Amino acid sequence: MSLPLSLQTLVKKTVASQCLSTDEHCILKHCGLWWHDVPLKLCMDRGQIQIKSGFLGEDIDLHIALIIAVKENNYSLIKLFTEWGAHINYSLLSINTEHIRELCRQLGAKETLEDNDIFRIFTKIMHNKTSGRIILCHEIFMNNPNIENKFTIQLRGLICKRLWGLIEIKETDELNDLLVKYWYAKAVQYECKDAICFLDEKYTDLNEWRLKCLLYYNKIYELHEMYHKEKVQIDVHDMICLASTKDNNPLTIYYCYALGGNINQAMLTSVQYYNIGNIFFCIDLGGNAFEEGRAIAEQKGYHFLSHSLTLDIYSSDASLPLNLKDPEEISSLLKDYKSKNLSIIWEYSHNIL
């Protein structure tokens, strides 16, 4: 006679929470606590159930584990994860057969997933920026027919916000293309090498995008590697402007300036995006586009910045050498650098307030 389901669930949950020797792995296999060729284990993280498995070598939130199990058509784990507390409606994101759909209905799933739920799942997976999370997000969302139009609008908005200045989204841009660029940018930002390799293997046209991401995220060593050794290049004036669209990017701004980039153009781009740190660093390097910058600031409604650029109190920083091109030397130069002109405007502001 079989045990009541609730007791089976409790026993499996207890076993999965234990550290068992390799000699006892046969027990886990017999109990259905085996996934991706390794023991399936439970742990708690800030009150949330996490699954330890062989999938991408990372702990996975229980709800996300359910999505993967559904995508793999793994009937036993779908039931098990649901019994352990996974929200069955998450399954709607990865259902790909009618048999699985019927199983999920029996377990209480709705017919469709709300757009806000889809968006919440996406942001939940991407909350921790690791190679595993980026690859997982790719596997779940890429070419997914279960994604509705409203979610597409939400996701476009998220990408536009997170990559402000790096990407300009057009109505004609395909969601899949935008997703790949977003995941690649996050992989570059957080130095997720496995995710970069994964995306490079799947998509062969990302070299220029990677160069742009390196500029945007102030990654001078990788930028130097691509620009000089791999010979992936774009116009140096475009490069310095792109480096200026995100604030506090002294390394890549300096690097592009040393290559011949127009520092005044970098200054004006920084004004356009209200990147205060970049603006005054450009002035440190000799930028003097004050009139043009003031006009842009006025047009944008940046009143304090507009006023600041009318002041005759700035000058280039003579202590900064302007000809370094080695990333190690540039990093050493700017490691503890404090902008001369930023200090001047802060002192001025303090005195008049």
UniProtKB/Swiss-Prot annotation:
<comment type="similarity">
    <text>Belongs to the asfivirus MGF 360 family.</text>
</comment>
<dbReference type="InterPro" id="IPR002595">
    <property type="entry name" value="ASFV_MGF360"/>
</dbReference>
<dbReference type="GO" id="GO:0042330">
    <property type="term" value="P:taxis"/>
</dbReference>
<protein>
    <recommendedName>
        <fullName>Protein MGF 360-13L</fullName>
    </recommendedName>
</protein>
<dbReference type="Pfam" id="PF01671">
    <property type="entry name" value="ASFV_360"/>
</dbReference>
<comment type="function">
    <text>Plays a role in virus cell tropism, and may be required for efficient virus replication in macrophages.</text>
</comment>
